[in-house]
Amino acid sequence: MGFPKVERLLINYKTLDEFKKFKGCGALELSMLEELQANIIENNSESPFYGIYYGGSLIARMSLYMKRNGGEPFEITGPYLELYKLEVLPTFQKQGFGQMLVNYAKQLQFPVKTIARIHSAGFWDKLNFQPVSVTNGDFYIWHPETNMNAITNEESA
């Protein structure tokens, strides 16, 4: 078994079955099952879902969307990534798999926006994301130009 790596997940029935493992682990706001079901096309390679397999099973996942322009409230100009619903199965938490997913997004060298869910603010702080408060909610942003040393070759996916 090789070292786990981040890979784009196919939108198919196998991935749908893998997502069901996460259903009882997290809050409803982290569920991707319905989102996947709505987009299911057998083996679609343009999936917004990324994950880490370990021992043949999906153990961590996230959604990653490219957005065209952040605009005023987001403090981002130009294209950026929205990272949603990062989740690691309980048995595999605190082993660096969540950080591997985030580093995958960072190595694309676009600003990354995310919402800290379920007491995860410390996680985003540790990964050099900056908190931003606006009238319609709080979120975190990582800017590649201000974090040039935030990713080392050993950390990137």
Residue ranges, per PLM feature:
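Conserved acetyl-CoA-binding loop-helix of GNAT-fold acetyltransferases
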Residues: 88, 94-107
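Conserved GNAT acetyl-CoA-binding A-motif
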Residues: 102, 107-119
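Short amphipathic alpha-helix that is part of the acyltransferase structural core
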Residues: 1-44, 53
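Short intrinsically disordered terminal tails
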Residues: 1, 152-157
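A secondary-structure capping/hinge motif
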Residues: 131-133
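Extended, folded domain segments that form the structural surfaces/walls around functional sites
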Residues: 85-86, 114
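Conserved acyl-donor/pantetheine-binding loop and adjacent beta-alpha core of acyl/acetyltransferases
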Residues: 29-85, 93, 136-142, 147-149, ...
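Conserved active-site tyrosine of GNAT-family acetyltransferases
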Residues: 124-125, 129
